[in-house]
Amino acid sequence: MDLDACMKVKSMNILFLTELLYPHGSGGELATYLWAQLLAESGRKVRVVTSSFPSEPERSERGNLEIFRLPTLGASASVKYCLLGRFDVLLSNFFRKLLAWADVVCIPRFWYSAIPVAKAYGKPVITHLHGYIPVCPVATLYDLSRNRICDSHNSCRPSCIIAHEKAHGKNFLETMGSTLLNSATWRYLRKLVELSDSVICVSKAQRDIIIAHMPSLTRKCYLIYNPLPELSEIEINGRDMGYFGGPSPLKGFNVLCSALRYVKNKVTIHATGFDPSKQGLIQFSNKSRILFYERLPQSLYEQIHKETHTVLVPSIWAEPFGYVVAEAILQGRLVIASKVGGVPEQVNGCPGVFSFESGDYRHLAELIEYVNDLSVETIRDLAAKNREVFLKRFDNKKVEQELMSVLDVVGH
């Protein structure tokens, strides 16, 4: 990028439109928050429009970062369809002023109805994909009705949507409503994404899948890894393991339970993202057990991390970029993860990461036993090497430069 282009990108006004923002949501929302923060700290003017929650101000400002919180923006159980109908926001004076201010509009989640509005105002749009929504209506590209990664190109199986919603605790009416909406409108969402000037994927694995299903995006689809949060190493005080994926079968909770039945020696798993009053405690015949916690604030996560030396990531879907993996390595933990999605890219070269084929619970059980038998000194040494390798490969300054290049392309 030449000096003039660099100065132009440096002075850009960037508008993020996202239904949720960290600390709400999951990995995609964390990535959006980190991007907004990173760009603001490097001198760009950044505005974010998101949903409001109790005790949060309607507007907050810190340096170059300004956040506007609108009521009930993401109140629907099916957020992507709720947002499609928010014409009261899209056609408001408030929104027109934001678009007039912006040089570039970024869509990091499901607010795709804003894409044609921004284009009508002559604003370039960057869509940031954290799942597979353009090629899969439930964004996972995993068919739970057949228990395998979906291979249905350009089609949508109602049985897949039904299985997905049931697995995530939806009742009959919610399941039928989701099936109807997803089957009827997901092709419309594809068309909206195609209007984007650039599409950013967060791993090579994700980009390859998206392009294979939508060749029309090939020339505008870029790979930029997510920025990393600033996390310090946490001292290891215990011999337990952690699982932070909640009850979702896509995150591999069923695989973990199956594996623990084959673990010969006792192991304790700290599992977050559950309703403790409903889940209680699972005790296995070998005296291994799972202790359940609800979704916790970062300070309480750190307390749990002190009791663990290894984080388990047994996902069965092709997760594009695993923040659980990244945070575990940055905080000085070993990782046992399935070889699926973008995770193998993340952990490449890390000596303290142990991988198994997705769904292979017997191999997972063997790895749990192997790691649990390692000495504390060996665990700490491997964890330190993990962090060193990881930080050399993933650098926030580098990913910022890569995003600047995309901003320069769409800004012309």
Write out the residue ranges for each language-model feature.
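A charged, aromatic-enriched C-terminal amphipathic alpha-helix characteristic of glycosyltransferases
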Residues: 27, 380-407
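Membrane-proximal helix-turn-helix segments that form the acceptor-binding/catalytic region
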Residues: 96, 145-199
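Conserved donor-binding/catalytic core segment of Leloir-type glycosyltransferases
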Residues: 200, 228, 233-251, 257-261
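Carbohydrate-associated surface elements
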Residues: 205, 227
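Glycosyltransferase donor-sugar binding loop
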Residues: 244-247, 268-281, 294
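Nucleotide-activated donor-binding/catalytic signature segment of Leloir-type glycosyltransferases, i.e.
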Residues: 280-302
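Short hydrophobic beta-strand element within catalytic cores of glycosyltransferases
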Residues: 310, 334-337
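Conserved acidic donor-binding segment of nucleotide-sugar-dependent glycosyltransferases
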Residues: 349-362, 370-376
